[in-house]
């Protein structure tokens, strides 16, 4: 029997969903949650293909992918709706290296950073990395607005219902704050 099985305190409840499935990474690995979004060039296909690309990242393993969701754009409204999902990864990459790998995937999918809230072929955001709080010029984890966005919270809670946002508490506690944001589940 593993040390974790002998000592329930070593399996944090924030990593266990209601079905009892454990997202705790193996020793030497980290748990990261990544938001996926697209609203150009067949966005459903873009998000599905991007999830495949996440599964092929060096030193990383895709553990879970939420259903796809349709949401209205944030900021600049005169653009197509977004297709969104959230993925759980186990990774041996440090957070900054994982962020660089996500940027590389975005570039593979033709992402251009023209202006804030611009339409995009693919957007990948590192939401959470273990329970770390990182505030650097290149990376803020937890993502600073994740608790205010239905397109992040709803798919995140689908794959990790007990998830905690460091410094903010249970992700589920923020659902009332986003209840006015339209979100439509499309498929698994």
Where are the regions a protein language model picked out?
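Flexible, gly/pro- and Lys/Arg-enriched active-site loops
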Residues: 2-21, 59, 73-83, 93-188
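Solvent-exposed residues in well-ordered beta-strands and their adjoining turns
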Residues: 37, 90-92
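A structural preference for short, hydrophobic beta-strand core positions in alpha/beta folds
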Residues: 64-65, 185
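N-terminal beta1-alpha1 ligand-phosphate binding loop
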Residues: 4-60, 66-70
């Amino acid at each position: 029997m593993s040390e974790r099985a002998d000592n329930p305190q070593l399996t944090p409840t924030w990593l266990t969903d209601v079905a009892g499935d454990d997202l705790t990474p193996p020793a030497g690995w980290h748990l990261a949650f990544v938001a996926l979004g697209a609203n150009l060039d067949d966005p459903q296909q873009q998000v599905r293909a991007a999830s495949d690309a996440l599964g092929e990242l060096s030193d990383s393993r895709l553990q879970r992918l939420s259903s796809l969701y349709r949401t209205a754009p944030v900021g600049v409204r005169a653009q197509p709706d977004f297709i969104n999902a959230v993925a759980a990864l186990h990774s041996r990459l440090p957070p900054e290296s994982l962020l660089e790998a996500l940027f590389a995937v975005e570039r593979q999918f033709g992402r251009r950073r023209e202006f804030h809230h611009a339409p995009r072929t693919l957007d990948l955001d590192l939401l959470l990395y273990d329970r770390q709080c990182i505030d650097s010029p290149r990376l803020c984890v937890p993502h600073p607005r994740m608790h205010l966005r239905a397109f992040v919270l709803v798919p995140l809670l689908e794959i990790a219902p007990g998830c905690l946002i460091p410094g903010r508490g249970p992700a589920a506690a923020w659902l009332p704050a986003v209840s006015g944001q339209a979100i439509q589940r499309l498929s698994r």
